Amino acid sequence: MAEKMGILGRKIGVTRIFASDGSAVAVTVIKAGPCPVTQVKTVATDGYDAIQIAFDEAKEKHLNKPEIGHLAKAGKGLFRTLREIRLEAPAAYEVGSELDVTLFATGDRVKVSGTSIGKGYQGVMRRWNFAGSKDTHGCEKVHRSGGSIGNNTFPGHVFKGKKMAGHWGNESVTVLNLEVVDVRPEDNVILVKGSVPGPKNGLVMVRKQ
């Protein structure tokens, strides 16, 4: 399925700017691009239409020989991260061309994908917002437990998807319908209203919606 065009970037942090009416607007600063096109895929050669973009310059010692050879074809240097974007008309892009923040304009709506902050192993009260058990009156050693996880003989197993303690965070998250507040091509920066997933300096993909 074809996607809207986008670029890779890094989440710099959160700040606020002031609108023309004097109101404060919380924004996330994303340093995005420039992202060179390293490969153009078509139905004839690869079975589907897409372009591959690169981001985050890297040293040769951090890449293997196949990666170095592949990036050399684009002639734009070495990069740490590669991503594909499926498009309906990839022929409009050439290997070696660059994508930058001028893809976006103030007022555009975008979706931002990233990896959420990992919280480690957490109990049900923090992970799923369970209320927990009573503090007193017959309750012993199970104040923060999740309670029963199923019946006995029937069904005889725990249903898939049951909310229990476990690893929380460090998973792919996409936030939709974020407004582009400002675009600053001279700094390769876009300002997006609201929050985006991931820690500071985390890798994100910003796509048109």
Swiss-Prot record:
InterPro entries: Ribosomal_uL3, Ribosomal_uL3_bac/org-type, Transl_B-barrel_sf. One of its GO terms (cellular component) is cytosolic large ribosomal subunit. GO terms for biological process: translation. Signal peptide: none annotated. One of its GO terms (molecular function) is structural constituent of ribosome. Belongs to the universal ribosomal protein uL3 family. One of the primary rRNA binding proteins, it binds directly near the 3'-end of the 23S rRNA, where it nucleates assembly of the 50S subunit. Part of the 50S ribosomal subunit. Forms a cluster with proteins L14 and L19. This is Large ribosomal subunit protein uL3. The gene is rplC.
